[in-house]
């Protein structure tokens, strides 16, 4: 398969790319590679020149990149930052999916939501502060956008979504310990635990699935 991976240089994008490129033709899109997906003209032009069997959308604006900063309450959140999360995580995602669909007669789209797109982020994980609410709201929107696209692009293009829980990387040990204690599986997810699921959703093995959101969170959302 030829697979386009957006956000290919991020935590999950890089892991998924390295796994899939063992058996598939991978095309990488990422801001670090000079691809600005918030630029509508660029997105239109790029997808008109590049077709594929599957689009895997790993890109997202996530406030973990600001983990060193003190987290405030909802009264400290600027509307500018709120709008930016929605613009990148929803508006840009819609643009990318639309241009893939415009230029491919059939295929698959795999989007990424998050467990915080299903339930609210817990303040006790952030010392009483808040993970940015617009991140969670945007990830909830990804689930609905996936259903919308699946409805309107079927049967030619299937669209599904993965909602992962917290992925272990370089968080401080206190965060990992608290997160793990709040999850039935008592640990965070390893970054390679989504690889085969993504490949499954890209393949004909999932040929009767569309509009689905698969939760992979160690049971986080069942409590």
Which residue ranges define each predicted feature?
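Catalytic loop of short-chain dehydrogenase/reductase
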Residues: 110-154
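A conserved structural motif in NAD(P)-dependent oxidoreductases
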Residues: 183-194, 205
